[in-house]
Amino acid sequence: MVRPLATSVLALTLGAGSALADVTPAQVWQNLQDYSADYGYQVTGTIEDAGNTLTVTDAVFTMAGETDNSSVTFPKMTFQETGDARVRVVVEGDVALNSRFTVPAPTEDLAEDAPEAGAEAPAEPAPAETVDMTMTGTIKVPGNEMVVSGTPEDMLYEYSYPTLAFDFTLPTEPGQDATIPVTGTVTGLAGSQRNVASDGGMTSSFDLKAAQAAMQIVAQMPAEDADAGGGTLDFQLALTNLASQGTGKTPGQAFDLGSQMAQALAAGMTLDTTVTYDTLEGSFDVAGRDENGQDQTGTGSFATGASDIAFQMSGGGLGYKATTADAKAEMTISTLPFPISYALDQISGEMLIPVTKGDAAQPFKLAYALEGLTFADAIWKLFDPTSQLPRDPASLIVDLSGDAVVTQDLFDPAMGQPQTDADGMPVSESPFLPETLTVNRIALDAVGAKADITGALEFGDNPNEPVGTLNGTFEGVNGLMDKLVAMGLVPQEQMMGMRMMMAMFAKPAEGNPDQLTSEIEFREGGQIFANGQQVK
């Protein structure tokens, strides 16, 4: 629900077709309604059409699903001809947002309602109890202007918002009345969106930029119990040179995206979006008491350099890819005797998840990488005060891909409604049946040791008995073990056992005794061989 709601606010207060011919205020208003309907919104409002000026008061865009309901309300929207074949659109008053959604009830409530010991178990798991949560907010856009040109089938919306300010009230946790305020501003927001009618649906593209964006949370946090006594939170976040581009396509029929997302994707709905920014800076300051009534405090800051985020959604799956450079964080917590500080040259991640149920296997991908990870000396001195371990920047790479059968649409509303077992505890079942897994690379380089693993596995009827091979090379492991013993972190007798275990799975490389190699073979029937020797 968050994505359609956010898209609606942008599209409705921002906007999208090419400047080719006249458009009228009524046609622009109709285009906005059509665009919203394609994303599952119902539109109501009081219309006054004076020909060259159309006024809509109390325009409400509502998306009602089986378990949630969201609305965006515009007090007044004025559509006025400019005299040069275009229409000027202005939003007057504060835009109001309201979103109600259903979440699982707290586990304490589930335990209270669980059947007593010895009671007859139900024939089928009962649906878990749920509670409603509500988010409200307002958006202010003083000095806003949007100019629309083109034709009824191809409209271009060009907008400018000197300042966009938001003020939201968010629930803290299920079953609680406490809320926290979230405020923020976006300055220098400008861009365009184009809506083109196609095949009964609509193809949209957008491009926007903002000089700065900031968000703040300053709140009194509710107490978890009588002893804890609550606390305070001050969270600040700021970004510079924010930009976003993207395209989207809706099919020629309306869907309730809250409960019919799977059907919409199957019908051809797509979304492809990128977000970039130059810098991100943030800080936090928290204070409160723990369960023993002792005061606790924590302060910290974090920052990153240039970041690039991409998101894609279609019937082929959900795709996500992100890269962030020059990340760093520092924090001081009262329960720790030292500050925590670390930095990263780059962090990246990539994910592709199939979402549509089908008999044929579909591709997936999971990748994650940390490059140039360093820690402050205060952390190193805890376990290596004499600097015996190399403190060179560490790195980690995890790159997996494969194919899996999807047994249930991931956007099926039933996926979001947890089931419980006979004891009233939540139960879950994976919607994925893996067929292949390729370990493109798993690599670790830290404290003078390196590990690099590749391989491929295939899965049959029993996913716990794969067939395939994993190959690994390891460097500096023996030297690291020696240093851990010398530092007193691992007793000599325990290290002997670890060396014996390692000898079962790895052997020295020819001509390089400090390099180890390993070939782990998984065979039919669950047998496992390490370097030709059966270990299971």
What are the functions of these language-model segments?
Residues M1-A21:
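Gram-negative bacterial Sec-dependent N-terminal signal peptides
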